[in-house]
């Protein structure tokens, strides 16, 4: 059976609110860390979310 190519990751807010999103990414095609501008409901504005390892 083949091992899955997708890895679960956590996108954590850089605003320091502790808010996060979970998603998955293909680790073969995107080996670099992801960074998105997403909405943080605790800060009530769009902030940068950086990838951290899901524990």
From Swiss-Prot:
Gene3D superfamilies: Ribosomal protein L33. Residues 1-27 are annotated as: Disordered. Residues 14-24 have a biased composition (Polar residues). Pfam families: Ribosomal_L33. InterPro entries: Ribosomal_bL33, Ribosomal_bL33_CS, Ribosomal_bL33_sf, Ribosomal_zn-bd. GO terms for biological process: translation. GO terms for molecular function: structural constituent of ribosome. Residues 1-11 have a biased composition (Basic and acidic residues). GO terms for cellular component: cytosolic large ribosomal subunit. Keywords: Ribonucleoprotein, Ribosomal protein. Belongs to the bacterial ribosomal protein bL33 family. This is Large ribosomal subunit protein bL33.
């Amino acid at each position: 059976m083949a091992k899955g190519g997708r890895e679960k990751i956590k996108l954590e807010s850089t605003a320091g609110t502790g808010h996060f999103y979970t998603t998955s990414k293909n680790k073969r095609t995107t080996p670099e860390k992801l960074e998105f501008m997403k909405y943080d409901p605790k800060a009530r504005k769009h902030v940068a979310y950086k990838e951290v390892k899901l524990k």
